[in-house]
Amino acid sequence: MEEQKKRTAREIIENYDGPAVRIMEVCGTHTHEIFRLGIRKLLPKQVELISGPGCPVCVTPVSFIDEAIYLALEKQVTICTFGDLVRVPGSQMSLAGAREKGAKIHIVYSPADAEKYAKEHPKEQVVFLSVGFETTTPAGCLSVKKAREDGLSNYSLLVANKTMPQAYQALKGSADVFLYPGHVNAITGTALLSLIHISEPTR
């Protein structure tokens, strides 16, 4: 029965004879799974699947990287960051390049790790680079709350968080269909979707 469902779904896709349609996903997990499962290869030629800016690191502005490097090199601040941000280029260099020049760049796996590092190194000013959409922002906020509870004065965030409605507004006209990340709704609720007004796509 399950195999029959799979065949039926594939037949529907392969026999699609409707109008051309552009579908955009804006979630890094969607991007990964579409690639892993080879979904693009299954789609007919008139269905175009586009990867949008689902990775917050990929859409982090150069100015943010420059500011982090300035804090690290000029103000001797310890930068705590996720590993995938280290090689993102600024206007002059990346965080990896700054580390080669003596900057303290500490890789963490969560904002909680950054707060813990600040607690264990009270003589260092520690700045966590907070990038991400609605799903990761609360963890950064929680780390600030924890730092206050721990009485820390050496922990802060450099923020470049983004929200999905604004991302969609910037992308309006780029696709006919958008795949919305369900885990964002788990944080914001579905009412946030009412803020999104997508215009007719341009051809």
Describe the role of every protein-language-model region:
Residues L129, F133-L192:
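Phosphate/pyrophosphate-binding betaalpha-module
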